């Protein structure tokens, strides 16, 4: 599959206080996953120094993204969702159902060493790093949501909560049917689900990079979804993120733009 240069071009890339932000888009499920995979696998080609890439997006079609190790899908689920696109993520975890214009997805790609113990300003021990990444971004996203939406005064009777057709059939299949200790809920419904992959740098086996994909079920909080709410959540996230994780980057933005266009072919 080719990654069209018009999907990620110079106009869609913005450097905000040392973090590369790719403009919010609404694309099909296969293309959304291809872009995330491309950025992660080509991270070393896109920048010569530590950097962080942040991308918020929505899905233009009904899509089920499958965890990397989810290989066997129950035929009954396939039949009930036969009009949905099923596409693999590069990250692990369980399946996520993406509804057009209803939920919001975040992808973050960066070096593992940005995740630090902020009380000690030290790197997190390797055995705790995955849990720490999950917890860090769940907290950042939740703080961004609650800063945007007054959840204390929400009338839950007006909310059309995210539900699936197969109910208990999806308990072992659906990410949002399973809540981890670090994940956030509202009125008994999971709001944020995160999945992670960590790999060695191709040019430095002693250091590692990570990709985090987080899905936010805003429809489990808001009776009314609109672009201003989504944009405010995104801006709050970027503000929180920059205050906590200030990455030292020199003038790499032009290099990044040129390299992203130059290497815009999957599988290189």
Predicted regions, residues:
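Short acidic-glycine loop/turn motifs at beta-strand connectors
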Residues: 60, 186-188, 200
């Amino acid at each position: 599959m080719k990654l069209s240069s018009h999907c990620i071009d110079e106009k869609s890339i913005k450097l905000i206080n040392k973090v590369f932000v790719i403009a919010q888009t609404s694309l099909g499920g296969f293309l959304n996953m291809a872009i995330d995979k491309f950025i992660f696998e080509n991270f070393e080609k896109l920048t010569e120094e530590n950097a962080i890439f942040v991308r918020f997006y929505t899905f233009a079609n009904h899509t089920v993204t499958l965890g990397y190790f989810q290989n066997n899908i129950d035929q009954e689920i396939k039949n009930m969702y036969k009009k949905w696109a099923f596409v693999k993520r590069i990250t692990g975890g369980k399946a996520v159902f993406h509804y057009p214009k209803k939920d919001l997805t975040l992808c973050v790609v960066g070096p593992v060493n940005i995740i630090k113990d902020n009380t000690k300003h030290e790197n997190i021990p390797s055995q705790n790093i995955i849990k720490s990444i999950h917890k860090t971004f769940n907290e950042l996203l939740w703080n961004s949501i609650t800063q945007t939406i007054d959840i204390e005064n929400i009338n839950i009777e007006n909310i059309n909560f995210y539900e699936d057709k197969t109910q208990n059939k999806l308990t072992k299949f659906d990410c949002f049917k399973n809540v981890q200790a670090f994940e956030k809920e509202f009125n008994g419904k999971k709001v944020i689900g995160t999945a992670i992959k960590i790999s060695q740098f191709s040019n430095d086996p002693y250091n590692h990079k990570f990709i985090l994909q987080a899905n936010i079920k805003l429809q489990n909080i808001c009776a009314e979804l609109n672009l201003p709410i989504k944009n405010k959540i995104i801006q709050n996230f970027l503000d929180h993120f920059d205050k906590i994780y200030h990455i030292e980057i020199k003038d790499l933005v032009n290099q990044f733009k040129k390299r992203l266009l130059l290497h815009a072919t999957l599988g290189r």
